[in-house]
Amino acid sequence: MRGLACLLAMLVGIQAIERLRLADGPHGCAGRLEVWHSGRWGTVCDDGWDLRDAEVACRVLGCGGALAAPGGAFFGEGTGPVWLSELNCRGNEGQLGICPHRGWKAHICSHEEDAGVVCVGQRAANSREDSMSLLDGDPWLALSGELSPSSEEPPITHAPQPAASSQNGPRKKNPRPPKQTKSTRAPVLTNGAPHQERLRLVSGPHGCAGRLEVWHGGRWGTVCDDGWDLRDAAVACRELGCGGALAAPGGARFGPGEGPVWMDDVGCGGGEEALRDCPRSPWGRSNCDHTEDAGLVCTGPAPRIRLADGPHGCAGRLEVWHGGRWGSVCDDAWDLRDAAVACKELGCGGALAAPGGAFFGEGTGPIILDDLRCRGNETALRFCPARPWGQHDCHHREDAGAVCDGMPLGAVQPTVPAVDSNSTAHRLLSTSVGQMPGPAGPWPPSASPTAPPEPGPEAGSPQLRLVAGPSRCSGRLEVWHDGRWGTVCDDSWDMRDSAVVCRELGCGRPRQPDPAAGRFGWGAGPIWLDDVGCMGTEASLSECPAASWGKHNCAHNEDVGVTCTGTPGLDTISDPFSWSWLPGLGRDQDAWLPGELTTKPSASLTSSVPQKPTKVPGKAPKSTKKWVTKNARRPTTQPPGMPTTKHSRAPGTPTSLHPTARTSELPKRLTTEAPHRQTSHTTVRLTPRVPWEWTSEPVVSQSTQGPQEVTSEATTTENPQTSLEPSGENTEGSLESSQDPATTPTAGVPVPSGPFRVRLADGPNRCAGRLEVWHAGLWGTVCDDSWDIRDATVACWELGCGKVRPRVGKTHYGPGTGPIWLDDMGCKGSEMSLSDCPSGAWGKHNCDHEEDVVLTCTGYTGDDDYPSWTWDPTSGEDLTKGTTVAARPGHTLSWATTTNTEVPSPATQNLPDTDDQGGYESSWTWDTPSGRGLFKGTPTTTKPGSTVTTSTSKSPGHPFPAPRARAGSPRKPTPERRPLPTSATTSSPASSSSPEPSGSRQTSGSWPQLIPDSKQEGTSSSPKPSLLTPGLPSPATFALSTPNTSLLPTRSPELSGSPTPTSPEGLTSASSMLSEVSRLSPTSELTPGPDTTPAPEIIPESSDSSDLPMNTRTPTQPFTASHPTSIPQLNTTSYPTIAPQPTTNPQQPRSPHPATSPQPPTNTHPSSTPATPTESLPSSRKTELSSPTKPRLNSELTFEEAPSTDASQTQNLELFLASESGPSSPSPASNLDPLPTDAFKPPRSQTLHSASDHLTQGPTPNHNPDPFGPCVSPLPPVRVMACEPPALVELVGAVREVGDQLQRLTWVLEQDRQERQVLALGLAQLVEAAQGLGQLSETVKRLAEVAWPPSTPVPMTTTTEEEERPLRGDV
């Protein structure tokens, strides 16, 4: 019975294990292994997991053999139970359940130990999970191009091909097709002459160094070194196949050449594919001779690598070409980081495994490399540290291999082109330079020369398709370009991009895929598009911004899949899981069986999709958002009937500027010499060197591609010498426009400049991360100087990510790399793009990457709320800078402000609150040199057609340096993120409208360097009396905002560190860092907070202020001397009369009797009472009433605009000051010097009488303290406890002593700082005086020159006074 039970259990186990699947892998035969048991999917623990277990699993799954058995949740952590652990297969089992294991149960392994497999074959990622059907035949055959023993060049490894296609010699390759030549360049084609410009290096030490020569017009010529730098050299080295550039010597370093000087003033950006694509002077035009010939020193040919004896071109034994032969790599220190670099160099994506031990068999050649130690971020193995070439201590049984997650993209292009003497376009080398190993001709074509051409899209059909899916409206997205179908990378891909694809294919709307969907297998061929950023309104994917054709950082495991809601067409198959994957074996594309689902649109659906030619995607600027409803661009069955127009990207090409709304490129460095009027239906981004005049007028679109509509058109009047910024790199050499310039209503419009693209990098999603801006072909960051909610609102709006999500603290997404493009952004919050905001010039900043802007947005709204193209970043809420106008469905944020006489379409109606009643429009004018004055902009009213003036000196590189009239209601201008002028420092309007340098003397007396935290709103920049000198009218006066300021919560004439709500906003002590110290001082009585209201019951105690000690020291007052150019000092002392000198006995207890409660009337002056709680200047702190120099200052106190103070408020102040007096605090008169004498100690027996330690808000009844003990005397009602123990009393006393010492130290430092300030002010004034004298002398000299020119003799006439003086000869 036991045997039967075991057999039954085994059968049950086998039945359970028969259902396997691989999840979260790059394809159907790689991923995390999951098993079905007890009605649930679970994972397998990696304890004991090895290649033998993976071999069984791959065989059960029908994926062939096993390549790797990664553990540690390599493909991510799974969910559910961990069903199996400690599998111990031999490798030949037919089922995984036959292998010994620890039983079916939920094991204690965590999902961090989930096992995975990488199998040889591939299946569809969405194929049946429990499918176990084997692939038909052996999908992986031998590689082509075996190396002949006598061959000196390496073979070119192609995609998997049948063994019959192997050759014993090098494969002949067609040359790279020439690019479209510019119309100004027509080289004379002689016998054997190249069809395009070629380069060579002569007179150098090797083939990758020497004098650069160019073939043009049937002759070799040189290049002038004017403007020649490393960026130009990098392009030339790359074109020559010589790696990177080491140096760019000029001055005929490699000897003078012969023939013409073909090129001059070359200005490459470094990213061009060929030197001919760089801006330069016309052919043959130069001001150079051969003593200025340019040269090159390149890094040399890079070694090539390949993966041999593997199942396909992206898995196998790693071999390196060196010394004219292939060799292997030793597996010492070989790991995934090294394999990742090799996979990246091969174009095979990332690394799945790095097997050693000759996993793919032993090599036969030399062992080239050993001890490779890559970091993983290198672009090629040659950049990794390793032993010298050929030095090793290994055997071929230690050969390293790699398994990559990508499939070979057609033929693997070698780094060094192969020599092909039969090629008519091979690279010619100097006869003095020996032939280098490896090819020297152009790279092989993208497709095999023997392969039949791929069938392209049918005439009039979209240039894209969905393949490998269950229907024509679901599958992997492929795009037709350059005669080939290619895939699209899923970087930045979202529902808006899918919406454009579904609309173009006539498949309805996109369907939100579940997490496991969206993958329809790996594509083949090139990856054409990456970083697609559609807005959702485009009629075609070609209108969306994206990276250049073929520029990406992806592998085919990132191919985009799209699922639309449209009804499947006639090519639908019945069972979506009835096909199997079969590689193309190098002959044709990889295909699905039965039948190739390459989704050719059926006849019934052809007329439902738009018919338009394809153009270069990714070049339309972000500002060309078509704020129209989706009905405005419905596909039509009418063919456009307009030929495709190509515009050359070469500079200087006489191309007619007739772009349309889809034009995406323009000639570089194009300069118009004559002014002409330009109109455009899109936002034309021009970089002005002179002011522009913007007018707005309604026009009726003449487009015949859709329903006519009334749109608003921005019209610009261009002045001479207006530079149009290039839009970036275009490797294709040409662009396409979908309209004929001759029939375009907007003929003569300049081509829009390059796209101002933004993105959020390194964040958890596309709407959170570090803000980066695309400029000059590079992504760069934005500095956070002056960045606030208004700038973030514009950025979120432009990204289509809704509103700004409030964050607590700062979210870190890591520092960026590359340049810091923008700084000092100054958006108002209503702009539609960051390019419309004022900022510093491109690349001008004072930041590092620790200050990069990070942004978190709420995300775009769903389709159920608004259409996919509308965003409401601020919901119209009034921001600090002004009200932001938000787009709503059916409205357009129009540039025009005039009311159309015709009935506008819903897509072009202005928002109700975008215009003034009179048709006026709000704009802003900057009048500071940097464009960032104290005010971001002063609101001005501009009529349509008027000029928005600005004197902002912006760099020409900035997209929109000038302010633009924005649609929106006028808003109050606010200062630029600086403390507003407070009542203590009321600056004149002139001083508040323009900033001064930080080092100059500000008229308001505010010195930011003296304020610990000037950015807090509650912090004041009060003027220092040491900076004010009598003799000049004061621009800053002290004014109280409310009559209740007499009740400000100060315990002494000095200010608290933070003002109360009734105080003027932003006004605190100029030395705000002492506010916390003052709370521990004897005068502050350890109050809980600054809002404490004095209790009236302490009033009687302040009458004995004469018993408290008085500091007899008079601190140095360097600021009491008169200064000839300073502002009068303001004395804010509340006691203009000299009080009688009190006794200095520190131990004499204070009398508790209330008979002495009335305050002396001479201690407080009613007119100066309001200033007492708001002034904390050192002059008042360091002034003694007995000092003979201070009464002079008392008369200088003025209160301009101060409200009258009634008697009750004055009495309240007196009561407040009296209540703050205690046994350890001086009287109000003595409080002018907060430094008590060293002999003063707070008496222990009287400590508890200073009951203000525990004051709370609100008055309490009076109590007469009893001096006989702390536990029996009546005390104020608010206390920590009913009877304070002696230990607490001693602690309070000790704290007060510490506060005294801290206060003494603080005031010593303050005095030293004031002396330094006075000295600095004196020096500054001396310098100003010297400058003034110099200017005066220059003025006198100029006047003298005007009065008596050098050619005119000095008149001899003298005045009567001069005649009475004795002449020099008479003396």
From Swiss-Prot:
Biased composition (Basic and acidic residues): 665-676
The protein's name in its UniProt record: Soluble scavenger receptor cysteine-rich domain-containing protein SSC5D
SRCR domain segment(s): 20-120, 199-299, 305-405, 464-565, 758-858
Protein's UniProt keywords contain Glycoprotein: yes
Organism: Mus musculus
GO BP: any one term: defense response to Gram-negative bacterium
Entry keywords, A to Z: Cytoplasm, Developmental protein, Disulfide bond, Glycoprotein, Immunity, Innate immunity, Receptor, Repeat, Secreted, Signal
Tissue note: Detected throughout the gastrointestinal and genitourinary tracts, in serosal salivary gland, the exocrine part of pancreas and testis, as well as in a few tubular structures in kidney. Not detected in lung and heart (at protein level). Strongly expressed in testis, kidney and pancreas, with lower levels detected in bone marrow, spleen, lung, liver, colon, stomach and skeletal muscle. Very low levels or no expression detected in thymus, esophagus, jejunum, ileum, duodenum, ovary, uterus, heart, trachea, brain, cerebellum and bladder.
Stretch forming the signal peptide: 1-16
Gene3D superfamilies: SRCR-like domain
InterPro entries given in the database record: SRCR, SRCR-like_dom_sf
Residue ranges, compositional bias (Basic residues): 622-633
Intrachain S-S bonds: 45-109, 58-119, 89-99, 224-288, 237-298, 268-278, 330-394, 343-404, 374-384, 489-554, 502-564, 534-544, 783-847, 796-857, 827-837
Glycosylation sites: 377, 422, 1044, 1131
Positions with biased composition (Pro residues): 439-456, 1149-1163
PTM remark: Partially N- and O-glycosylated.
